[in-house]
Structures are given as structure tokens and as C-alpha cells.
């Protein structure tokens, strides 16, 4: 027996993209249904991605800070908790996030359906509930916000108890904590978990399929991360690809195409993502995906079927929770108001939660050089800031790229603790209109003292002193 419901819009997925769309639609008076395949709202971001990994990272960075501070180490024993115990903190944060986000949907009168959604026709979905019951949902518009999952090459046995991806690593038991781990893939996820495991004292082999880390970053920032990893004992192997991954009873051996072999207690595969679209039965409505199952969309996030939108990780780049929410918001405006002029901001900040953090907004030196833009560089080393000295967070720097003639800020790159927060000061000034986005602002404004924000004044003065 099927129960049928009609709505103005159905949103598939309750992560940042789905939430942004649902909230925007509901606030415009639409009747909205949200379908979530997991038992709680929040999506992969809350349950297996951003929230748990950043909660892990925060605890471990504080433990490192405690253990390295001579004031504490002289009088107290160092702290060495397990990955499993720190996960309990992450789970506590997840529960808070779920409760808060569930309340958002309730307050905005969104109808929640927990189960797997699949298309019957372009305007109708079937939802299979956990107890096996079926609901059909009809709507004038549908928003696909199903996110992504770790990419699994067919040649790797992910059922092996010592081979993990970014979802299964969060199920690591206390007795399974490795002393040595191989991380295959040195993208954002791979680098973040390399920091996490090395911070726990685990030996880390980081296998990178490219010639340097995080190639989309400014070269200096990438080099700073590489040096920091090297200085902390992470072994990085660039330009390597696996030929065979061999799961053993007591470990994993990675056979590389270069002829090398690497052995460790376990393998964490972090090389790519794939869109969560297979179960939607898109073939029933003639909607196609690319080879990684990502959907193609217009600048308003419309798919090839104009009444069906897609937002968030299911469309691939930039695969940021922050961007996903805004994509959902923009899609909701297109649906309710027909607005076609709203766009994501041009300069989306990126935050990478390694230890220390990395954050960037705007152009890199390499991009400006290729564009033949006459730019100059201003730098501030954190070790010269009073606040960094007080906090014992002296590793890192801030780098401002600006036009030599107009002094317009072109890019900001930060490596160090709190980088993802610090970057937003520069981002706010970059977005100013009518000539307000110049490096002179940082020289002429007054900063609290002592603060990490002072790095902007130091970097601005450093850059202006280079002009002639």
C-alpha cells in the first residue's frame, strides 16, 4: 500500500545544499518535503565528513599544543588518547548538530521523509522507508542534494578489515588503532587525516599521485605544508600510483607502479569522490551523469530537465559545505522568484583543516603570473605577532597579493592556526566596491592588540615597502 503526497518542491538530501534549498523555499511559503536516506538529518557533512573530521582535528591540535608547551610538560604528564576515544567527542558534536538542524526543519514546517528516494517519472518520486513501506511524492520542482561518497576502484577490496575510506575510518575501534598507516591520495581529505594520525603519534606514509601537495594552492603554501609534514615525520611519496593493493591478516602492502612496495598496519584510501546518484534511477527520467556520477547543471543549478535542480557535492566542484548551502539558497530563489541574476561570489574562500590550517581566497601567484598581472606580495610571519607568541602558535604566515598600481587586493593565502577564521577579514575587504578593496585599508585601520588579525597590517606594510 503506497501513500501519496503532493508538495510544491521535494528536496532529496538534508546536508548543507539540501538545507539551504529547503529553508529558502519554506520561507517563501512553499510546501516542502525533504527526503533523507540516513536515520538523521545533516547529510554526509554532519555524519561522515566535515563535522567529525574537524572535531577530531580540533581535539588533536589542542593535545599537541598541550604536550609541546613547556609550562605544562614540566609539571604534568603528556596526553596520548586513542583515535577511538577522540571519536566520542566528535559523536557528541554530531548529536548537537543533528538536534539543531532537525529543529530548523521543524520550525520551518518542512516535511521529513526518512528513506531512499528514486524517480518514477520527472515529477514523481518513490520513497522506500526503513520498515519497507512506500510513499510517493509529487512536486512541481525537485532539488537533488544527495552529496557524494568515497570513490572505490573495483580492484580494491574495501570489505577487507584493514582497508578504509573516509566513511569507514570513523568506525575504527580502539583495538584497531594502527601504529603505521598508508594514506593513498594527498588531496584535502588525505592531507587532513595525515595531520590527524601523525598528531596521534601514528607513522604516516602519504602517497600522492601528483608532483606536489594540493596543486590548486599557491605554491608557497603547498611548500609550507610539505615542509611541515616532513618536519613532523610524515613520509610523502610524490608521483606514485598503485599497481596492486594487497590486504593481509596483519597489514596491507601497496605495490606501486614505480616498483616500490609500502607496508603498514592499514590503508586509508582517499583518492576521489563519486556522486550519490546511482540509487535515484535517473535513467527513468532520461537524466545523465558524468563518469564519476556527478550531475551537470546550469549557473542556476538546473539540470537538463529545467524543473529539476542539483546542488552541493552531487555536482562536483567546488565540493565545499559553505558553497553547497549557497547553491541551495540560489536554487530556491530561482524556483520561487525566477531570479536569474544571483550567483555565488567570485572569490570563494577555501579552508583546509590540516595541522596547522590552510585558507585561501582569490588568485595565486602562479595564476597572476600566467595572466601577466603586475602584482606585489606582502608577507607576515606569525612568529613576529605578540598574540602568536603568547598562544605558542608561531608556525605560519599570511600572504597578501595586490596590484602594484591600483593596490587592489588580488589574493590572500594563510598557513597557520586559525587560518580559516583569519582569511575572512581579508575576504570582506576584497569584496568592497568603489575602490575600497585596496591594501591601504589594512595600514589605515586600527586592530585590537594583541591579535592574529594584526598580521594584515604587518603584511600590508611589508608589501607597500616593496613598491618603488
From Swiss-Prot:
GO biological process: 2-oxoglutarate metabolic process; NADP metabolic process
Cofactor note: Binds 1 FAD per subunit.
Subcellular location: Cytoplasm
Annotated positions binding FAD: 36-45
Reaction catalysis annotation: NAD(+) + NADPH = NADH + NADP(+)
A single MF term (Gene Ontology): NAD(P)+ transhydrogenase (Si-specific) activity
Names of the cofactor(s): FAD
Enzyme class: oxidoreductase
InterPro entries (alphabetical): Class-I_Pyr_Nuc-Dis_Oxidored (IPR050151), FAD/NAD-bd_sf (IPR036188), FAD/NAD-binding_dom (IPR023753), FAD/NAD-linked_Rdtase_dimer_sf (IPR016156), Pyr_nuc-diS_OxRdtase (IPR001100), Pyr_nucl-diS_OxRdtase_dimer (IPR004099), STH_gammaproteobact (IPR022962)
Record keywords, A-Z: Cytoplasm, FAD, Flavoprotein, NAD, NADP, Oxidoreductase
Predominant subcellular localization, coarse grouping: cytoplasm
GO cellular component: cytosol
Protein purpose: Conversion of NADPH, generated by peripheral catabolic pathways, to NADH, which can enter the respiratory chain for energy generation.
NCBIfam families registered for this protein in UniProt: PRK05249.1
Protein name: Soluble pyridine nucleotide transhydrogenase
Name of the gene: sthA
